[in-house]
Amino acid sequence: MDGDDLIASVYRKIEREKALITAASNMRQSTDNPLVQQRVDANIRDGRKNIAYLEEKMRELQLRRMEHEGGGSPTDKRLPPNPEAGPVPPQKDYGPGYGGNEEYGDASGAYPHGGAGSMPSGAPYADPRPFAPVPKARPNYTKLDLIKYDTQYLGPKIQLMLSQLEFKLSVEKQYKAGIEKMVRLYQDEGDRKSRADAEGRRIESNQKIQLLKQALKRYEDLHVDIESTDTPDDESLSTPNLRKPLTGLLTLRIHAVKDVDHAASSRFSRGPETFIVLKVEDTIKARTKATRIDRWQDETFNIDIDKANEIELTVYDKSGDRPTPIGMLWVRISDIAEEMRRKKIESEFNASGWVSADKMEHGGAPGRPDTAGGAGSAHPSGPGGPGAAPSQGYGDGSAGAPAGNQVMIDSWFALEPVGRIYLSMSFAKQLKDRRPFDIGLNRQGAVRQKKEEVHEKQGHKFVTQQFYNIMRCALCGDFLKYAAGMQCADCKYTCHKKCYPKVVTKCISKANYETDPDEEKINHRIPHRFEGFSNISANWCCHCGYLLPFGRKNAKRCTECGLTCHSHCTHLVPDFCGMSMEAANQILETLIRTKNHNKTASVSSGLSGRTLRPSGTPQGPQDSAAMAYPQKPVESPYGAPQRQPSAEAVSAATNSYMPPQSPTAAARQQMPPRTSSSAAVAAATVATGMPSPQQMPAEQNRPMQPQLPTYDPKAYEPYANAPQGMPPQAIQHAAPAGYGMPAQQPAMQMVSQQPPEAPQQPKVRIGLDHFNFLAVLGKGNFGKVMLAETKSTKRLYAIKVLKKEFIIENDEVESTKSEKRVFMIANKERHPFLLNLHACFQTETRVYFVMEYISGGDLMLHIQRGQFGLKRAQFYAAEVLLALKYFHENGVIYRDLKLDNIMLTLDGHIKVADYGLCKENMWYGATTSTFCGTPEFMAPEILLDKRYGRAVDWWAFGVLIYQMLLQQSPFRGEDEDEIYDAILADEPLYPIHMPRDSVSILQKLLTREPELRLGSGPTDAQEVMSHAFFRNINWDDIYHKRVPPPFLPQISSPTDTSNFDQEFTSVTPVLTPVQSVLSQAMQEEFRGFSYTADFA
């Protein structure tokens, strides 16, 4: 539909609403019945609200047409042409700065107004004005706000209800079909009682279907098919880490219903009796008393919730033998919990007078009316409304008392298809480790996504995935409702656990899909004709199983068979147009079974006359070379190495983890492939101690032969001399030569930046007997950090001790090796603000990192002792920034920036420590997807399960500056889920007197869109260094430590540990005995770990 047709359609909708209002007004004048008048008044109110919404859409369409014809400005489309027309419906899930055309909107990422102060030359200068225009903050509403009767956000509500009602309608139709089968079954059996009961449920199901159709028609009539190109999808629909089922106590009080369409009754009878049924996950939990006045005096229910997602309220009228449903409401329990979290934060910040950045910019008053209104106070006309409940909660909700006892959500909610219901409700989550809400900063451990067991099937790497949304199986087409299923780690193919063994279609994200034998494919090769369509109902992707986003931006439909999918999934859907996936898989299974049956005799006879290689025999030179240097796949899915016909799954797994090909490796891969079976490969793997292709690290290449390669200084030149500004393609090939080298090489050879003409002196092999342990400084997931001194020189070191058993059990071998390589990068230039490594060694049970000892403690300890001033926070931020800049210039993202990991030296400067979550080979444009980090510092793109790049470090840098300036976190909650909700939904608040430069840098670093975030461009740290917050910083003086530090930590002696947590320092510094014995293959995993730095 083009622009003119859309405008005409909206005009017709407006005229229809006006006609309905006119008819309603005439009816009101012609009746004296108060109930009819009340219902007509509600219709008129709704009609006026609809007209305001449609007129706003009309203005938006007209403005777009003017822009298209060259008569408007592209930036004007975000402003309402007529501000008096009421609130502008926001774009769905519109984030701060999403798609703005202002300072960060252009593709070049340039900052046109020039720099100020001491800025690095050649940087893209930031706007020196402290409150230069930034991308607009999004309207702050929750999903619960959208289902409230008086919501201002009609546009997002229409989108939400269209998808929700379509899904509810499809489920109800399935339920009705099942009931009809039961009716026929009981009729055949002659069971009259059961048949009558089933017949009653069938009638009720029919009535609910009519209600749902009526509600759906209402929203479809209001929907305007406008799709903004920069409107983000609702990622919460396809994010497995969000919206988990909750357990706790739900408190619900039902006060009244209003404006509902009551069931018809006879002329002389009394009105129908009305009651409400409450269901939790389709199970009836409560029922109100019947009333004829639409109000209830004391209907309060306390319901224990056990891992549930949704509650359903159904209003019934009983005028005859059977009750008739007249209105329905669905509320997600997670939305209730999220609303209560926001109310607690509002109460705290309203009392303190803090405001969001946009209110500070426009001189607004303290408080958050956008969310305070959304939280809901008692409706003025609410009967018996507990008006004191919200104020009581606002006063006490942040005092650490259980939230469910004080804070209540009190509001009118919209019933479907018509009417409203007045509810007061709260939800107290059951938490294992509840965090006090009213205290400042505290230590938090990092989290890392555990590696799931992989089930290989036809090239797919299926892992068990718990889904918290309604999913659809790609094989059988049935729903997975809040259940665990199987999902391919590569192509995201999703199906039931019971269905994944039946999957015969191959993972076509693999490059070898087109080279597979024809007999393993089906001859039904009719490609789908996918075209974009406007998705205004509940449709699921036929490949990944997620609900398609609303609108036309990311939805495709086959014009022939009607199959729907995401735009990015179209190339993964097999060419089975006109055939269901289940039928296609049955045909393929039959073909393969027939083929295997025909080959059984020939295979048996072939094996009888064949000499098999013993499992322990070393492989030939071709195989050993190929295994010694596994190559990472190029991003393109084409041009993969030849596969081994007898080990399709092994080949597919190998292809997915192999690094970029070098010329020699490419030549190796052109050799004829071996035909050894996968069993022989596995046997050789065990015998030689080599990891399987799946376990082969992407950055660590390890030869299988024991002889060590010779040191070649030329191999290090590309990495040592690579200019910082070289393009990503050049960096990608030059960088691995510096530190992605075989692990068996002597440790001193891996320090690649020493001049080759300086001869390497032989070093004493360092071991456990060289040290005395003095104290425990900290503990982590797999071990502890201990203070130790050398027996000979009495020099102090911090030694990180990790148990090999835990490393292997948690599949962290490669992570440990990567941590060592990042230490090498830090050692390369002895960076002043990075912790240096002196040595590594190992025993039979543990590995040890010998690091420099920083006796001043970490910044978390010091900020708990007292708030940092602006100058002190700015000083530490500048030094941390240079550390991040160095990491990024060397292709490393840090991913765990926090106060706990920033150590303070005795001379007052910082050292960034703990490289356990660092990721290598992350140059500009490179992305990864591991879910890891410390909850309060994790960027939104990590939480949304998106691929992310080095911009996540700049988000964490913004959280760090916020904590140093304000001594609290911008995103808080009582558990990790609440913190994640805050990161995705809340706007950080600031004291009204906070300097504008400080607010500006935080606002730009804490931008949810990574491509718009300060520091996300190709010049990386230069963008942040150019900001006005660092106007007075001389970066050369900071790097060379010529700036006097603002604070010097004090110790009484070199071994004084008073700057470390007493919880750890009070523990006796001993290594606990390890009873388990590691096999030779396990020990082989740590070959080449030992290392001694040249400056040690």
From Swiss-Prot:
GO cellular component, one term: cytoskeleton
GO terms, molecular function: ATP binding; diacylglycerol-dependent serine/threonine kinase activity; protein serine kinase activity; zinc ion binding
Region annotation (Disordered) ranges: 67-136, 356-399, 599-682, 739-761
Compositionally biased spans, kind Polar residues: 599-622, 746-755
Domain C2 per the UniProt entry, residue ranges: 231-349
Short name of one Pfam family: C1_1
Domain AGC-kinase C-terminal: from-to ranges: 1031-1096
Superkingdom of source: Eukaryota
Keywords: ATP-binding, Coiled coil, Kinase, Metal-binding, Nucleotide-binding, Phosphoprotein, Repeat, Serine/threonine-protein kinase, Transferase, Zinc, Zinc-finger
One BP annotation, GO: intracellular signal transduction
Catalysed reaction, written as an equation: L-seryl-[protein] + ATP = O-phospho-L-seryl-[protein] + ADP + H(+); L-threonyl-[protein] + ATP = O-phospho-L-threonyl-[protein] + ADP + H(+)
SUPFAM superfamilies the UniProt entry points to: C2 domain (Calcium/lipid-binding domain, CaLB), Cysteine-rich domain, HR1 repeat, Protein kinase-like (PK-like)
Domain REM-1, chain residue ranges per copy: 1-67, 148-225
Bias (Basic and acidic residues): 67-79
CDD domains: C1_ScPKC1-like_rpt1, C1_ScPKC1-like_rpt2, C2_fungal_Pkc1p, HR1_PKC-like_2_fungi, STKc_PKC
Protein name: Protein kinase C-like
Source organism (scientific name): Aspergillus niger
Species classification: Eukaryota, Fungi, Dikarya, Ascomycota, Pezizomycotina
Gene: pkcA
